[in-house]
A protein has these predicted regions:
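C-terminal beta-signal and terminal closure region of outer-membrane beta-barrel proteins
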Residues: 22, 26-34, 76-102, 191, ...
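Outer-membrane beta-barrel proteins
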Residues: 25-29, 44, 134-138, 219-224, ...
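Membrane-embedded beta-strands that build the outer-membrane beta-barrel scaffold
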Residues: 1-2, 35-45, 52-60, 146-152, ...
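Outer-membrane beta-barrel and related beta-rich outer-membrane complex signature
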Residues: 8-13, 53, 60-79, 168-193, ...
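Conserved small-residue
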Residues: 27-33, 46-140, 265
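C-terminal extracellular loops and terminal segments
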Residues: 26-29, 74-88, 136-147, 151, ...
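Flexible, solvent-exposed coil segments and beta strand-coil junctions
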Residues: 13-23, 123-131, 204-217, 267-275
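Extracytoplasmic gating/loop element in the C-terminal half of outer-membrane beta-barrel translocons
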Residues: 112, 166-252, 257
Length: 297
């Protein structure tokens, strides 16, 4: 597929400076394109007492900005034209400063010290500013999504499963983006930089006002791929001979659930790979267990 959207209603808030004081109307100027492919295959087989069905579907999709209003003076490496619609704009990093010598011998934010993020000087001007941010190809929207439906029946017993997954997506794990109402998580606190832990995984302790660590940086991006058991149901139908004496045509018992199992890298951060939850307002996937009986009279 190749789906082009044009005449998208947007304001010229980027190219018109704020100091004009203008409240701009929406114009039909935006344009994007989504390219990709959908593919599916299904196989089934039936015998006298056993039958099964196995399927696989996959979608690869890549969005691209054709035109978006952008400021004329932003660096080329920050422009969204030609990139994914929701591509990340981040500071690139070399990890964490471990020594004062590393701070002294590199461009850095004012007040930088060992334990802070080591931000790259992208424009090579000897200082770290907003111009050093880079728009990267990755986004929170996966380029690959797939599903594997499976069903099998043997006599009166059946099982129905749906596996889902995604790949080629990045999520921001920076918890302080949620503001001061959110306490730092234990994973960030326990492995933070200290004098006794100079080889820590994460920077020094910081809050939501920290200008050196509480920033959108590639250091905080993680692979949001997952493989999940989206739904499962096991059922059993009672024999008709047993039910006929009670005037019942059919009785089916079932048990199952949704969101039962997942393989992903986001559990350690208490985040859902399907939810880009940097603000804390998105509710994660709900796990549901259910049992019941269907009766036909």
């Amino acid at each position: 597929f190749n789906n082009t959207r044009s005449d998208i209603l947007v304001q010229r808030n980027a190219s018109v400076p704020l100091y004009t004081g203008l409240s701009l109307p929406r114009e039909n100027i935006g344009e994007t394109v989504n390219r990709g492919v959908d593919w599916s295959v299904n196989f089934s087989e039936t015998s006298r007492e056993f039958k099964y069905n196995l399927g696989f579907n996959l979608t690869y999709a890549q969005s691209e900005v054709i035109f978006r209003d952008e400021a004329a003076n932003i660096p080329e490496w920050q422009k969204s034209t030609g990139k994914a619609v929701d591509s990340w704009v981040v500071y690139e990093t070399n990890g964490i400063y471990r020594t004062q010598a590393e701070v002294d011998n590199s461009a850095h934010f004012s007040g930088a010290k060992p334990g802070d993020l080591w931000v790259k000087d992208t424009d090579k001007d000897g200082s770290i500013t907003s111009n050093d941010r880079v728009r990267i190809p990755q986004s929170a929207t996966p380029k690959i999504a797939y599903g594997i439906p499976m069903k099998a029946e043997y006599k009166r017993i059946s099982i129905d499963l749906l596996w889902t997954g995604q790949s080629m997506a990045k999520q921001m794990i920076l918890p302080q983006a949620q503001g001061s109402i959110v306490s730092p998580p234990t994973w960030l606190y326990n492995d933070r930089y200290t004098a006794d832990n100079p080889n820590s995984k994460y920077p020094v302790a910081f809050n939501d006002t920290d200008p050196r660590n509480n920033i959108a940086a590639d250091f905080w991006l993680r692979d949001a791929s997952f493989f999940r058991l989206k739904s499962l149901e096991v059922s059993y139908v009672l024999p008709e001979k047993m039910l006929s004496r009670f005037g019942i045509l059919n009785m089916r018992f079932y048990a199952g659930g949704t969101n039962l199992f997942s393989i992903d890298n986001m559990k350690q951060y208490n985040l859902d790979p399907e939810t880009n939850n940097t603000t804390g307002v998105n509710y994660p996937q709900t796990r549901i267990y259910r049992v019941g009986v269907n009766i036909s009279l």
